[in-house]
Amino acid sequence: AAQPLVRESYKNPISTWETNVMGTINLLNTIKDFKSCSIIVVTTDKVYENNSWNYCYRENDLLGGHDPYSSSKASVELAVKSWRKSFFNNKIKISTARAGNVIGGGDWAHERIVPDTIKALIHKETLVLRYPEAVRPWQHVLDPLYGYITLAEKQIKKQKSYAYNFGPDDK
């Protein structure tokens, strides 16, 4: 589990860091004595230093994050890398998966575009967009999920663990 909302991270930065970073570290520490397994830790595409480039971020781009959510998730990336190199010794395959904005069933969180639109329509209220000029690449939640499962299967066979980006086609 994680604290998944940027705006919530401003309201509760300590809780965000405790949940996202220490929650992951506790999990990593628990599995370090396993004989073998394949783990995918899902972070976010917001782990990158935001340089406002005109291309999609690549896995080896600089990590950063100016808000508590993004920087805590970048720290999760570093924790996974540290445990991979310090404790796992190829017996535990662990990769990070960085996905962007997803839509799909089960997401009724506050301040999410699809649930907020549905709620506004049901209650005949005006939908308020936080950043109407923003353009975001959306993908259905099952698309990256399929990728995570495929990655977990492949990393068991190939013994390679890295960071991977999951996003929609650039169309």
Language model features by range: what are they?
Residues 115-127, 138-164:
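Alpha-helical substrate-binding/gating segment
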Residues 99-106, 128-139, 161-171:
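Glycine-rich Rossmann NAD(P)(H)-binding loop
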Residues 1-4, 43-45:
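Conserved NAD(P)H cofactor-binding loop of Rossmann-fold oxidoreductase domains
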Residues 5-9:
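Serine-hydrolase catalytic-loop signature spanning alpha/beta hydrolases and amidase-signature enzymes
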Residues 15, 22, 113, 143-146:
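Residue-level recognition of oxygen-bearing side chains
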Residues 11-29, 33, 37-38, 47-102, ...:
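Catalytic helix-loop patch of NAD(P)-dependent Rossmann-fold dehydrogenases
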